[in-house]
Amino acid sequence: DGLDLVARAKGITILAAAKQVADVLAMPFPEPKPVKEQPRTVKPIAERIAELVAKSIRGESPYLAKKGLQCPNQRLLQNSLLLVTQTLDGTITGAQTIKPNGEKRLVSGTQKKGSFILASEIIGTPDTIIITEGYATALTVSQLHHDGTVLAAIDESNLLNVAELVR
């Protein structure tokens, strides 16, 4: 185009060429406006998870039903299982969703390392704590083993982290 031709002929930048052309045509050269920065406010993860929990309903998860687990009181969000993750002191660190087809996702901003999903309540200081890889396994174990606490470490890479914190 014309600006490129002027820039090449005079050995200057496109911006400098545009200024020269504006001067020749007696046109004011617009000054660039600074980009308005909108402060990005990200809600704390516990607050975002609380909002998701409030939107959820209680029901039976198709994912768990396919695995043969009858658990009618699960938290569901758009037909996906909504599992809140936490630390030993009860701090909410995020959530995992599991779709009916088994696709698992962590909610954006979830802190996975050292977090787990409770499959049974932590009452006092339990004598036995069983840590499983995933939630379905944790539920199965909690139905078979009524003494103690069962935790799901979200995935294999987090098993050691959770075990070290529990110890």
Provide a role label for each language-model segment.
Residues 15-16, 45, 49, 74, ...:
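Residue-level detector of intrinsically disordered, flexible termini
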Residues 1-63:
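Non-catalytic accessory segments of DNA primases and related replication-initiation nucleases
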Residues 79-167:
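Phosphate-handling DNA/RNA-contact segment within nucleic-acid enzymes
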Residues 13-14, 29, 71-73, 149-150, ...:
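Secondary-structure boundary/capping signal
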Residues 68:
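Short glycine/Trp-rich loop-beta-loop segment that forms part of the substrate-binding cleft
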Residues 53-54, 73-75:
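Short linear motifs in intrinsically disordered
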Residues 60-63, 71-74, 93:
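Phosphate-handling catalytic cores of nucleic-acid transaction enzymes
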